[in-house]
């Protein structure tokens, strides 16, 4: 399983640490990561994977709830969606 995680919110310390900790807690591996601050806003994109089958509804709910604790918006989408878009 491969997925794309995006994080957007007002910049503050601890966002990368918190999100990467949650990724590890959910049994996902970070394959690639990029983050930047645009004006006062933090943005991050990570490619994550797992050898095990993952329930995307569960992951989506977990990241949504966790994002609220950091006051950021966290999204997770299957990488297969992006691969299908470019293989038409």
UniProtKB/Swiss-Prot annotation:
| Classification via Gene3D superfamilies | 3.30.70.260
Which Pfam families does the entry mention? ACT_6 (PF13740)
Q: Which residues form the ACT domain?
A: 4-77
Q: InterPro entries from the entry?
A: ACT-like_dom_sf, ACT_dom, UPF0237/GcvR_regulator, UPF0237_ACT
Xref: CDD domains: ACT_1ZPV
Where does the signal peptide begin and end? Answer: none
What top-level branch of life does the organism fall under? Bacteria
Please state which protein family the record places this protein in: Belongs to the UPF0237 family.
Q: Which NCBIfam families match?
A: PRK00194.1 (NF001220)
The record's listing under HAMAP family reads: UPF0237
Q: Subunit composition? A: Homodimer.
Annotated protein name in UniProt: UPF0237 protein SP_0238
């Amino acid at each position: 399983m491969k997925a794309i995680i995006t994080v957007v919110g007002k910049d503050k310390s601890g966002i990368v640490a918190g999100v990467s900790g949650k990724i590890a807690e959910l049994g996902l591996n970070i394959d690639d990561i990029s983050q930047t601050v645009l004006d006062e806003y933090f943005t991050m994109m990570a490619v994550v994977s797992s050898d095990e089958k993952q329930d995307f509804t569960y992951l989506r709910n977990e990241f949504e709830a966790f994002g609220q604790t950091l006051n950021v918006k966290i999204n997770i989408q299957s990488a297969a969606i992006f691969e299908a878009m470019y293989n038409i």
